[in-house]
Amino acid sequence: IDPYSSLLSILFFSDLFYLEILEKRYEVIKLKSKDVLIGLVKRRFFIAWLFVELLALVQYSLYLMKVNNNIGKMDNLSMLIITLIATGVSIAFFGYLTVVLVNITKKIGIGVGIAVLIWFLLNSTIGMNIFKSANIFAFCEFFTKDLDYSWVIGKLIGAIIVLFGMTVFKSSLIYYKNEVKRYDN
C-alpha cells in the first residue's frame, strides 16, 4: 500500500497550484499576497493528502477483513495504525516533492516525470540496497523481517523534509511570477 499510495499522490498533487496558471485564473489569484497563496496551497495540500490517506485506509481495511494477518503479537488494529502513519508520511513526501518539482520546472509533465523516476529509484532493489533503512519505502520490509523497526529512520527523514520545506521554504509551494502587478487599496 505504501509505494502505490505515494505513486497516486504524485498524480493527485501535481497540479495543486499549477492548475491556476493552466486555467488562466493566476492573474486574479496573484492579486492576493504571497502568504495568502501559500495558505491556499497548504489547504489544498492537506485536502489532497487526506483524500489519498482515506483511500489507503479503505484499501488496507478491506485487505485486513479478507486476510486475518496476525504477525507475532501485533493485532490488526495496531498494524492498521502503523501502516496509515507510514503511508501518510510517504504520501506527504511525494506530494510535496511533486509540487516543488512542478513549480521549479514550470511544466507538469517534467515535474511528474522526475518525481516518478525518484519513486522508481527508491522503490527498486537498487534504492533499497543503497539507502537501506533511510529509504522512505523501507517500511515494506517491516512485516517480512519479524517486525524490524529500522524503517522509522526513512519515514522520519521524509517527515522532516516535508515539515522543513513547508515551513522554511514555503515559497517553493507556489509558482510566483513577478510580472503581474498587484493593486493594494
Regions found by a protein language model. Name each.
Residues 1, 109-185:
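Terminal transmembrane helical anchor/hairpin motif
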Residues 1-16, 41-108, 146:
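Secretory targeting signals
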Residues 15-25:
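Membrane-water interface of transmembrane alpha-helices
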Residues 22, 36, 106-107:
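A helix-boundary/kink motif common to multi-pass secondary transporters
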Residues 25-27, 45-60, 157-168:
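N-terminal hydrophobic signal/anchor transmembrane helix of membrane proteins
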Residues 26, 38, 109-110:
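Secondary-structure boundary/capping residues
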Residues 28-29, 101:
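Broad structural signal for hydrophobic residues in well-ordered alpha-helices, predominantly aliphatic
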Residues 29-37:
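Short helix-to-coil transition segments within interhelical loops
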